[in-house]
């Protein structure tokens, strides 16, 4: 998963994407059920299925019958109305472009989940192509026939994505995969004859590279039947060779060249030292391979590899750039000069460069500060580059760059919703010291307040990102802006050691048993808040999803005197039980990051830093949210910490989504989650 994807996932887990405006005085507080104003009449709630949870007393939440809760009071109708009113902000995800650059395939949400849409001209009408209840994540045009699409779709949040074929002429959709394995990383050959993707179909544990002809996609051939995780990256022109990645962890991956017909493979990167591999692509003539890796330096850089002589030292095209290269696009038009485009992550913001493939000469493209992604050169147009762009104050939309003139053309305009744009804020980048000489970078968002001359101490919400190999960046987050503008709180998004974007030494600084030392970054964050004249250390809440959920629980357990409230979304409560019960296909990948719990010395450290082991120390009010179908952090991680705190007493809210997995994707669940989270923060942080 790319750093940007990891970041976006972390924000999605902790805060669903909703909108806001500043009316602090009108936000009602959560009340006891008997005293609450009547909520709008919900649809009849189904009887919960037998045994959905080990927590007794769970009942469907009004308006979200698949969300079962206990300890959560009735949410005031006015607050639900506020959430619904600001729940319609949208963003556009660039998925693919036709070979001539005249049609764009994008993902956006008009109903409950993200679906496929087609745009056929700049600022043209969006035509919806898929209408399922489950979200669509990846999609590709068939190059020689853009009426045919292949896409990956989830089911119930379990992340066992299935591959489908859609013919736009007949609207016929056909399931290509087996309906039960996990499938990902779809690539299509330049000519459109072949497809490749990663699949766990063989044994549920190992991830193989699968090949199919696009005309007969159900006839499939496994190109790898090896232990571990393998995925396809790019076909060579002609489709006879395929770049594949072997991944042991986020910091340990190798690049291979696979002969499609014979199955023979050749290593393109040396065995040592271990290094990350972000992506790799063939040149338009297939004679060179461009890869983004930190194998030859401290940061991820663009290198040119000769596949005929992989043992030779590669040409390091961006060795002078002191920041991570985060994405790569290579033009496919063989009748035009070779063209590359990259982004560089400088202090959390993306810079776009065009790269001369031979010399590595960089040509900056001036764009507003923000985040970029989804880069695509149309196969037959090396003079056009499509990309998605967002800033902290504007939703993600799709743009096109004319490479010759450097002019950009907007293709989509996503709705902001009924938000006063003047209330949206940009963050300030701050740094503060932690143990061992580490400097922790963080983004601070503060509400716009009238200049009265008084210093007002603001309550603070700390948002921990997931991963842990993620990075907090200034993405467009309507809910983060809601917290700032509506609740009047400051939001701090730290990048503790172990985050991407600051070099591989910083990334590895929390690996294995070093995680115990890295938890001191939590204390450093709280100390920094206490040292600020305009932040209130007596009113601090923390939240986060996945690994950010672990940090949320860890803050509550190990810094109990410095915290008022915590909102844990699909977080790890015990590393030992997490590693034993996470899906088999990802268990070894996570052991490479957290340590092997089967080693007694490692197990002792993991137990010591697990919040469940110190649950009796938690004093803060706690709200735990979990998806029943989570393949990454199982439901038991949430329920064992809830049970421990219920026995101890105190404020504990719990919500379980029956039709979600690792985070909440359905709009009705996200709306209910946000309404409850706002009510929780009002009761526990702002009173």
Across the structure, where does each feature detected by a protein language model lie?
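Boundary at the C-terminal end of the N-terminal hydrophobic targeting segment
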Residues: 19-25
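Peripheral, non-catalytic segments that deliver or gate enzyme domains
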Residues: 86-93, 103, 111-117, 131-457, ...
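Blade/loop signatures of beta-propeller domains
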Residues: 53-82
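Bacterial N-terminal signal peptides that target proteins for export
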Residues: 1-8
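Active-site-proximal cap/loop segments of hydrolase catalytic domains
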Residues: 493-687
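The conserved beta1-alpha1 loop
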Residues: 464-466, 626
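Bacterial N-terminal signal peptides
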Residues: 8-16
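Hydrophobic beta-strand anchors of alpha/beta hydrolase catalytic cores
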Residues: 461-463, 491
């Amino acid at each position: 998963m790319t750093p940007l994807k990891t970041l976006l996932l972390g924000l999605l887990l902790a805060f669903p994407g909703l909108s806001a405006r500043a009316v602090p005085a009108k936000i009602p507080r959560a009340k006891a059920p008997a005293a609450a104003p009547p909520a709008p009449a919900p649809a009849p709630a189904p009887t919960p299925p037998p045994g959905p949870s080990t927590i007794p007393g769970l009942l469907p939440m009004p308006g979200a019958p698949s969300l079962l809760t206990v300890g959560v009071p009735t949410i005031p109708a006015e607050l639900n109305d506020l959430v619904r009113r600001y729940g319609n902000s949208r963003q556009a995800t660039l998925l693919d472009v036709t070979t001539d650059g005249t049609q764009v395939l994008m993902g956006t949400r008009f109903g409950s989940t993200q679906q496929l849409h087609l745009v056929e001209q700049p600022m043209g009408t969006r035509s919806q192509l898929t209408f399922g209840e489950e979200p669509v994540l990846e999609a590709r045009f068939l190059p020689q026939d853009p009426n045919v699409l292949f896409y990956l779709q989830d089911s119930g949040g379990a992340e066992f994505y299935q591959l489908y074929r859609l013919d736009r002429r007949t609207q016929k959709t056909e399931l290509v995969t087996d309906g039960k394995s996990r499938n990902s990383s779809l690539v299509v050959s330049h000519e459109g004859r072949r497809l490749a993707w990663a699949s766990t179909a063989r044994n549920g544990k190992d991830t193989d590279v699968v090949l199919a002809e696009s005309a007969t996609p159900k006839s499939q051939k496994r190109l790898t039947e090896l232990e571990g995780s393998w995925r396809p990256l790019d076909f060579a022109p002609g489709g006879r060779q395929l770049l594949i990645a072997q991944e042991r962890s986020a910091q340990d991956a190798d690049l291979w060249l696979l002969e499609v017909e014979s199955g023979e493979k050749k290593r393109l990167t040396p065995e040592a030292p271990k290094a990350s591999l972000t992506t790799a692509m063939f040149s338009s003539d297939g004679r060179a391979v461009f890869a983004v890796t930190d194998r030859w330096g401290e940061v991820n850089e663009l290198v040119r590899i000769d596949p005929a002589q992989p043992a030779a030292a590669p040409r390091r095209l961006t060795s002078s750039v002191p920041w991570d290269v985060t994405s790569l696009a290579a033009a496919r038009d063989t009748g035009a000069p070779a063209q590359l485009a990259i982004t560089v992550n400088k202090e959390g913001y993306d810079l776009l460069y065009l790269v001369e493939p031979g010399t590595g000469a960089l040509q900056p493209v001036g764009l507003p500060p923000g985040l970029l992604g989804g880069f695509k050169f149309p196969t037959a147009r090396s003079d056009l580059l499509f990309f998605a762009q967002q800033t902290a104050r504007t939703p993600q939309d799709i743009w096109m760059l004319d490479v010759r003139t450097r002019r950009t053309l907007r293709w989509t305009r996503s709705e902001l919703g009924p938000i006063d744009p003047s209330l949206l804020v940009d963050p300030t980048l701050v740094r503060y010291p932690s143990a061992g000489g580490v400097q922790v970078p963080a983004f601070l968002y503060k509400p716009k307040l009238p200049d009265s001359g008084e210093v007002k101490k603001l309550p603070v919400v700390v948002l921990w990102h997931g991963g842990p190999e993620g990075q907090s960046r200034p993405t467009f987050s309507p809910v983060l802006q809601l917290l700032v503008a509506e609740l009047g709180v400051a939001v701090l998004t730290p990048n503790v050691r172990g985050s991407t974007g600051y070099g591989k030494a910083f990334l590895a600084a929390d690996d294995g048993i070093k995680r115990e030392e890295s938890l001191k970054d939590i204390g450093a964050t709280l100390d920094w808040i206490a040292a600020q004249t305009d932040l209130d250390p007596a009113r601090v809440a923390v939240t986060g999803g996945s690994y950010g959920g672990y940090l949320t629980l860890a803050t509550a357990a190990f810094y109990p005197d410095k915290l008022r409230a915590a909102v844990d979304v699909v977080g790890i409560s015990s590393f030992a039980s997490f590693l034993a019960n996470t899906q088999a296909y990802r268990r070894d990948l996570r052991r490479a990051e957290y340590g092997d719990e089967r080693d007694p010395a490692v197990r002792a450290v993991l137990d010591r830093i697990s919040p469940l082991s110190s649950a009796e120390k938690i004093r803060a009010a706690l709200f735990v949210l979990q998806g029943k179908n989570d393949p990454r952090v199982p439901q038991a991680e949430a329920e064992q910490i809830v049970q421990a705190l219920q026995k101890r007493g105190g404020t504990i809210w719990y919500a379980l989504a029956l039709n979600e997995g690792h985070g909440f994707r359905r709009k009705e669940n996200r709306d209910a989650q946000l309404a409850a989270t706002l009510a929780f923060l009002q009761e526990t942080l702002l009173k």
